[in-house]
Amino acid sequence: MSTALFLHGLDSSTQGTKARWFRQHFPQVQMRDYVGDLSQRLVQLEEQVQGLEKLILVGSSFGGLMATCFAIRYPERCKRLVLLAPALNFGEFQPPLEKITVPTLLIMGRHDTVCPPHLVQPQAEATFSHLQVRIEDDDHMLHASFPVLDWPNLLI
């Protein structure tokens, strides 16, 4: 059985728009509030998923960076990643020496000025060997695109 988790962005929380949407439409999606820097948040995520396998990590912005870093460290524990405007342009992130094979859907907004596709996509292509890319007519928040994604299939 798979476990789906939502990883919120840096300045967001489980009270953010996407988290509230998941609670309303897909209450099985697990989430928690992450605090601190990237390494602290990754420790919190590791504690949260201790003993779990077949993880479906849905990461928004900084949460997408968290999901990517977790998958690089534990690819065998990840079933799928859904990266929503991930912060792969964050200065500390470096793609791994060898691409990981976790199936990954990368969704970006064409008008995103926080995590612009021209900076994020090359990082994703250097990280994942099984990458599907969608560039939507949207901005960083992906408010128009997010609710109409194929969540019933992405979360199984």
Which role fits each region the language model picked out?
Residues 100, 106-108, 112:
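Short beta-strand/loop motif that positions the catalytic acidic residue
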Residues 28, 125-142:
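Catalytic histidine neighborhood in serine/cysteine hydrolases
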Residues 58-67:
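Gly/Ala-rich beta-loop-alpha elbow adjacent to hydrolase catalytic centers
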Residues 76-89:
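A conserved short beta-strand
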Residues 2-52:
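Active-site catalytic motif of lipid deacylating hydrolases and related acyltransferases
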